[in-house]
């Protein structure tokens, strides 16, 4: 009985196996509130979306807490597709707020600190000077989701430093 030969299945030598390629990161020129909150969920940030109920402004804003530090995200531009947003926190200053803002702005180039006056009671007789810290995040040139996540992670570090700095607990020599 003649032997049957079984051809072996081998890949031809001229075929190259291509490594798996990742999809190119999606470039975003705008974000919706849903996309922002999806990123906040991923970063496990506590937040609440609120609407400004004033007559001239119906834009949403997001109140957040990250590492026990409160801040706001204020979308800017024509909604629902926002081309930029503002990260903002407000802190009391234990020392001279004007001098502290100058020192902070010389040290941290990532954001800006400035003073503001608020009224502390209903009669508007008592005023308190507070410090606001802001960072504008523009998307108009196109950014990736990873860039936005990194921006929030850097903002968290700034929040912690700012809180310590303006409350006199940060050792700048360390």
For the regions a language model picked out, list residue spans one by one.
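Short, internal acidic amphipathic alpha-helical interface segments
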Residues: 83-130
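Charged/polar positions within long, soluble alpha-helices
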Residues: 113, 160, 164-167
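Long, continuous compositionally biased terminal/linker segments
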Residues: 64-96
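Charge-rich, low-complexity N-terminal segments
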Residues: 1-74, 115
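Long, contiguous binding/interaction regions
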Residues: 157
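Hydrophobic residues embedded in beta-strands of well-ordered beta-sheets
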Residues: 60-62, 80, 129-131
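Well-ordered alpha/beta subsegment
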Residues: 119-153, 164-174
């Amino acid at each position: 009985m003649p032997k049957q030969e079984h051809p072996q299945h081998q890949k031809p030598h001229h075929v190259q196996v291509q490594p798996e390629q990742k999809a190119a990161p999606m470039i975003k020129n705008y974000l919706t509130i849903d996309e922002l909150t999806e990123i906040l969920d991923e970063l496990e940030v506590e937040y609440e979306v609120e609407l400004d109920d004033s007559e001239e402004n119906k834009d949403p804003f997001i109140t957040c807490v990250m590492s026990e530090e409160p801040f706001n995200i204020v979308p800017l531009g024509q909604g629902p597709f926002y081309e930029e947003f503002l990260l903002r926190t407000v802190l009391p200053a234990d020392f001279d707020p004007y001098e502290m803002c100058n020192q902070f702005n010389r040290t941290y180039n990532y954001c800006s600190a400035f003073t503001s006056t608020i009224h502390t009671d209903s009669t508007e007789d008592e005023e308190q000077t507070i410090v606001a810290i802001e960072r504008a995040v523009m998307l108009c040139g196109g950014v990736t989701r990873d860039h936005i996540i990194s921006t929030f992670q850097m903002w968290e570090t700034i929040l912690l430093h700012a809180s310590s700095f303006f409350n006199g607990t940060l050792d700048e020599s360390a």
